[in-house]
Amino acid sequence: MKIFLKTEDEIELMRNANQLVGNTLGEIAKHIKPGVTTLQLDKIAESYIRDNGAIPTFKNYPNPFGQPFPASICTSVNDVVVHGIPDNKTVLRDGDIISVDCGALLNGFNGDSCYTFCVGEVSAEVKQLLQTTKEALYLGIENAVAGKHIGDIGHAVQAHCESRGYGVVRELTGHGIGREMHEDPSVPNYGTSGSGVLLKAGMCIAIEPMITMGDRSLCMMPDRWTIKTCDGKPAAHFEHTVAIYRGKAEILSSFEEVERLERN
C-alpha cells in the first residue's frame, strides 16, 4: 500500500477540481425532472466539465471485467447502487431517485463527488433513506482527523445506518484520491473503531456511504458496470472528497449549489 500525502499547494489544486465537480452537480441539478433521460444529463455534465478546462475522469475508465466506462457520469436510478450507464432509454419519472457520481481531472488532480437526487415527489420512506445516508456521510467525515483510523470512519457510518434498519454495502468502498482517481487507502463504510490505517495530515480520501433500503446484497448486471440491489429495493449514495488538513477534515467538494436549488 502506497499512500500519497499531499502538500498544501496540492490540496489547493484538489480543492479547485472538487469545486468544479460540485458546480457540475449543481448544473445537473437544474435538469433533474420527469421526462429527462440519463444520457441528456451525461451530455450536460461532459460539456460543463470540458468547458471549464477539465477532463471527465470517468469517461473510458478501465474495467478489468469488461469494456471501459462509456460516459462522463454514473447515473444510478432507484435500485441501481452504483455505476449506472447513462442512455437514452432511461427516462426519469416522478418518484424516482437518481445518484449522480461525477469525477473531473483539473490541473493534474482529481475531484470526485456523488449526490442522490429526488425526481419530483418521492415517498417519505425514500426521503428518510436519503437523509440517513447523507447524515452518515457527515458522521464519517467527523472522524477523518489525524490520529484516528480508517475504521473510525466506517464504524460511524455503519452504526448510524444499521441502527435505522438499513443495509450497508460492503463490496464497494471509498478511496484515496489525488493525481489518480483511486488511490490507497480503501475507505469502507463499515468497521471497528481504532482499526485500520492511521489517518495522517495530508491524506485525501473520498468518503461515500452506499446504503440500501433492504438487504445489502448486490447483483452485477451483464454490462459489467451496473450494480443493483438484489432485492430490487432503492439505494442512496452520497460522496465528498476530504483532505485531512491541519489535523482536521476539510471537505473539498461541495453540495452548496445543489442544496441551494433544492431549497428554492
Describe each model-derived feature in a short phrase.
Residues M1-N264:
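Active-site neighborhoods and metal-handling regions in enzymes and metal-associated proteins
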